[in-house]
Regions:
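Active-site-proximal helix-loop elements at catalytic-domain edges
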Residues: 1-13
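N-terminal low-hydrophobic presequence detector
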Residues: 1-3, 49, 190
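Deubiquitinase catalytic domains
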Residues: 97-190
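Papain-like cysteine protease catalytic cores
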Residues: 11-133
Length: 190
């Protein structure tokens, strides 16, 4: 099991990266975390989501792409569709296992199983009236798996973390009210 799987649940408070803004998609408010590109962005985003930093990016790339390479016959047809060409086992190793080619739907679907995560990819585009719109691609491992939300815009993945600031403030206010009620009860019982 990859490092950090059991221990880490991402929130904006424990990511070792600055957020680069907010975005509202459907009814959810997300913080956006940009990651380095260069063909590694999805692996960087997955590492940031699972461990809170980028330290496992190459490990995740190696685990995911080696699984495909080692079972190439099983994934070959899917690879032809996702890589838009007949890719040989040798070429796959050079481009994906040891290289820095972008991940495709094949690598993402394998990542869900290896990283035991549901991966939601939000594709940012424009509708017929030039309004920003989003399309969601879901890669599901299981209903019990953690959810990782990614934004894909201009061929670059960014991590999305649900912004729970409002929920945290509400929770704090609720706790403060409960505390003051208890304090008042104690005061009046004296």
């Amino acid at each position: 099991m990859p490092m950090g799987y059991e221990k880490f649940k991402p929130s904006q408070n424990n990511l070792n990266a600055p957020n680069s803004g907010r975005i509202k998609i459907e009814s959810e408010d997300f913080l956006i975390y940009d990651v380095p590109g260069g063909g590694q962005c999805i692996f960087h985003a997955l590492s940031l989501a699972i461990t809170g930093n980028l330290s496992q990016s190459l490990v995740y790339r190696s685990l995911i792409c080696s699984e495909i390479y080692n079972n190439f016959d099983f994934y070959e047809d899917q690879l032809k569709l996702s890589h838009h060409s007949n890719i040989s086992r040798h070429a796959y190793r050079n481009k994906m296992v040891h290289g820095n080619q972008w991940a495709t739907s094949t690598e993402i679907s394998v990542a869900t199983r290896i990283l035991q995560s549901n991966i939601n990819i939000w594709l940012q585009g424009r509708d017929g009236h030039s309004n920003i719109c989003f399309t969601k691609e879901e890669y599901i491992n299981s209903s019990l798996s953690r959810n990782v939300d990614l934004l894909l815009h201009q061929n670059h993945f960014k991590l999305l973390i649900k912004n729970s600031t409002e929920k945290m403030v509400s929770s704090f206010i609720r706790q403060a009210l409960q505390y003051s009620r208890k304090a008042m009860k104690i005061h009046f019982q004296k």
